[in-house]
Amino acid sequence: MCFDKKIHGVAALTTHILAVLAIFSSEFSLPTWENIQVLLIGTILCRGPRRISSVLRVMGLASVRNFSKYHRVLSRAEWNSLALAKILFGLLIKLLPESWPILIAVDETLERRRGKKIKAKGVYRDAVRSTQSKVVTSFGLKWECMMLIVPLPWCKRSWALPFLTLLAPSKKSNEKAGRRHKTSLDWTRQMVKLISRWLKKSWILVGDGAYACMDLAATCIKQNVTLISRLRLDAQLFEFPVYEEKKLGRKRIKGKRIYLKNILVDQKQIWQTGIVNWYGGEKKTIEYLTFICLWYHAGIPPIPLRIVLVKTPNGKSEAETFFSTNVNLDPVQIINYFVLRWNIEVTFEETRAHLGVETQRQWSDKAIARTTPLLMGLYSFVTLVAFKMNQIKALASIEAASWYDKKGELTFSDILALVRRDILFKKHFSKSENKPDLRKCTDKMINALIYQLSIAA
């Protein structure tokens, strides 16, 4: 591990950043590690597009001649992104309270990119621009993301902290490269197996309706993972078989078909009420119906599920159906876990707004596969640094004023601003180690600071 004072980035490494960053040093060679420190601090301080050129300007290295070494960190340097993901995951696990389960949300996101050299790109449905009546498609890269749901002391809402992000190349690009195409569910199954090897204990996976797949559910059960997702009303659900004594032949593997739509209109059904944690931190009273059944499709062994039918609180749409592969899980808790999944959507938006996801312009295959996972991981890294800061002194928004009180609720933009403030104070305004006088800022430091203040957000 090297933290040489002569390195441009090290002068801005605060004690809180060092406490988190030092753990990753073993995964890099010494030259790469020195460059990583510069890029890390520059990316945190940078506003707007996160490009190597922008990062170097922020760090006062606009006139450096061997700038290509910083580009090679992403495009050529030898380091393992999965090893970094494992270390980051281990750090995030330590943030969980003892009573909090290991709850991981999975989802895919589209990074809009164009260009002939972007080999893995494809044409996908753009969830942000599409509506229920109109589908909008965009060129781009599809990423599969795993995020740990963590409650944090400065916010009532739990945060989804990314730790594992994988590129899912399009079918056309795989065919052109002669590779077997993997769907989003294939990548998810692979990620489930990887995380289970890391944890070596049970955990919970939450995904939207796109992850309501029998193959994924079967994989989760084998890996001692509970899958929670939304189910279609026309899903093939069956009662448990009734075995008749003294009857010859193969035993039945399923009973009568269960039609969810018929259950919804059945007046004999007794609906229960429960209070759940709803979106926005509110409490909602819902009506729900729960039962255990079998999920079956030809060629796949039947899977026992806990089904929860929920009447929407606003009553504007038909009932929603949720399921859990753990049939012993409380139905209200299943809804609470699924509601927490929405935090992954918040993280996607905040990484675009504050960390420059979709603004990078790398075109080499290795750099593309590394840059977005690093930016997603930076979201968690900044949160870890802020958590260290909060342990010493409770964090408060720097935007607080006599006319504006955030009442203790901090967003990621607040956290990022506090970490930036800590870095800038250490870099430009901290006292000298040997003398009580303030360190004089060089022209390069002043120009870099003025550049940060003057550029558009």
Q: Which residues make up each language-model segment?
A:
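Short, basic, glycine/proline-bearing loop/turn elements
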Residues: V73-E78, L199-S202
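Gly/serine-rich nucleotide phosphate-binding loop at the start of the catalytic core
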Residues: G9-S75
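Single, function-defining residue in the core of a domain
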Residues: C2-F24, F28, T32, M59, ...
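Short gly/ser-rich anion-binding loops that grip negatively charged ligand groups
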Residues: L45, G60, E78, S99, ...
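Generic alpha-helix structural propensity
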Residues: N35, R47-R51, R65-K69, W79, ...
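Active-site-proximal, Lys/Arg-enriched surface segment
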Residues: R76-L166, T290-W295
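Short coil/turn segments at secondary-structure boundaries
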Residues: I36-Q37, I52-L56, A85-K86, F348-H354
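Amphipathic alpha-helical interaction elements
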Residues: I44, R76, I93, V339-L340
